[in-house]
């Protein structure tokens, strides 16, 4: 499988057909309609992007890296959660062909904050259908079997849930709200609930109705579909869209600040190639090591060795060459999780804990506030942090500082 995806973290650069732009659904209620979501134009953490299929027959290739347990669960999800209750026909494949809609992999991708994600490589066959949604073949489903995420793969029920969930993203199904309420106020039982290990293993009737009511258009595959260039994002951590994250987005700023191991004011001074994870297939995941110069600690604490500089790891889902596309942020507030904390929580050996303690990641994929010429800038879907966007950066820092007290 190719790794020239400009990352979908959505990585996908959409091929513009007749100037159409993929539609975006909004709202946090349950039972969201089928849609593609976000262009996938930057290597972020991790690439995640929802696309729709281009027909009612959905071909899924099982890569040799897929564990036996995940293969069994994915096979069951295809049959019991999708083929039987919907108008879709699910087809298992042992290799990738021109008909392949999704390819499933599993590997230890490192502690990047997500147990699974879906993305569409930029060089995969793709386009925009008459409904304005991006369709994509050969989408990649990645299950991260790093020990930190063992709870998502610990038993048949957990694997059944996560495979049903990620498969739904390849068809355009989106996360339900948190809690996953239906329009009548009830709680929906669906595998499309976000961040719920060992959650439901089937679709809600809303999901089934949306699949059955959507026109998955069969459109010609362009001879070449590199996509049109998209302007770089100021914030690469955009939306938590098609990932199964381990750290749920807190509902209040105080909860978010207190959940971080450290909240620091600082800037990225250097980005260099870092560690490499993944040996089960031929697409290893490279990381960038970003040097974060710490100006002050706003909340939490840092060990003595990291009080002036620390290493922030950034996954390079578009391959090692995409390190050149990463921004070197100016002054910003970073909400951080030390990877040693995660290693300790899952009971890794002391020597592994010590090794992982040298690295940090973002608490959530939107845990960043940038000083944009004196104004605070956040991702639109940064939860409590988004309320700081547009204020003076100085005022935003003060609010964060007070929230941690």
What are these regions (language model features)?
Residues 1-27, 228:
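Secretory targeting and sorting signals
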Residues 17-69, 220:
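Disordered inhibitory propeptide/activation segment of secreted metzincin zinc metalloprotease zymogens
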Residues 28, 139-141, 148, 158, ...:
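Metalloprotease/metallohydrolase-associated module, dominated by Zn2+-dependent proteases
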Residues 71-182:
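Metzincin-family zinc-dependent endopeptidase catalytic domain
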Residues 222-240, 283, 317-405:
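Netrin-like (NTR/C345C) domain of secreted extracellular proteins
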Residues 241-259:
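Short boundary/loop segments of OB/S1/cold-shock single-stranded nucleic-acid-binding domains
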Residues 266-268:
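Conserved hydrophobic positions within beta-strands
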Residues 278-314:
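OB-fold (S1/OB) nucleic-acid-binding surfaces
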């Amino acid at each position: 499988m190719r790794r020239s995806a400009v990352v979908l973290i959505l990585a996908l650069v959409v091929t513009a057909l007749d100037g159409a732009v993929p539609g975006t659904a909004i709202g946090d209620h349950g039972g969201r309609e089928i849609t593609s979501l976000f262009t996938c134009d930057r290597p972020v953490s991790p690439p995640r992007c929802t696309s729709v299929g281009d027909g009612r027959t959905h071909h899924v290739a099982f890569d040799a890296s897929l564990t036996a347990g995940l293969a069994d669960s994915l096979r069951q999800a295809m049959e019991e959660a999708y083929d039987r209750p919907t108008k879709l026909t699910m087809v298992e494949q042992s290799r990738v062909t021109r008909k392949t809609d999704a390819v499933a992999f599993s590997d230890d991708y490192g502690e990047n904050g997500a147990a699974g994600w879906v993305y569409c490589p930029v060089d995969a066959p793709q386009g925009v259908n008459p409904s304005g949604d991006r369709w994509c073949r050969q989408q990649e489903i990645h299950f991260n079997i790093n020990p930190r995420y063992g709870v998502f793969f610990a038993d048949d029920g957990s694997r059944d849930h996560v495979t049903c969930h990620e498969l739904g993203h390849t068809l355009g199904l989106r996360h339900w709200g948190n809690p996953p309420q239906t329009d009548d106020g009830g709680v929906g039982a669906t595998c499309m609930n976000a961040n719920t290990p060992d959650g439901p293993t089937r679709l809600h009737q809303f999901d089934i109705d949306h699949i059955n009511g959507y026109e998955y258009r069969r459109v010609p595959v362009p001879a070449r579909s590199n996509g049109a260039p998209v302007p770089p994002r100021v914030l690469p951590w955009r939306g938590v869209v098609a990932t199964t994250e381990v750290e749920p987005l807190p509902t209040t700023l105080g909860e978010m600040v207190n959940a971080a191991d450290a909240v620091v004011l600082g800037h990225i001074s250097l980005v260099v190639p870092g560690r490499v994870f993944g040996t089960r297939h031929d697409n290893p995941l490279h990381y960038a090591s970003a040097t974060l110069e710490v100006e002050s600690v706003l909340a939490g604490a840092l060990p003595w060795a990291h009080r002036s500089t620390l290493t922030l790891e950034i996954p390079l889902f578009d391959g090692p060459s995409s390190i050149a596309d990463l921004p070197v942020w100016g002054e910003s507030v970073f909400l951080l999780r030390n990877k040693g904390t995660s290693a300790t929580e899952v009971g890794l050996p002391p020597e592994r804990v010590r090794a992982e303690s040298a690295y940090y990641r973002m608490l959530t994929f939107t845990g960043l506030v940038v000083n944009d010429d004196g104004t605070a800038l956040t991702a639109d879907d940064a939860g409590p942090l988004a309320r700081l966007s547009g204020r003076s950066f100085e005022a935003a820092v003060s609010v964060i500082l007070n929230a941690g007290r």
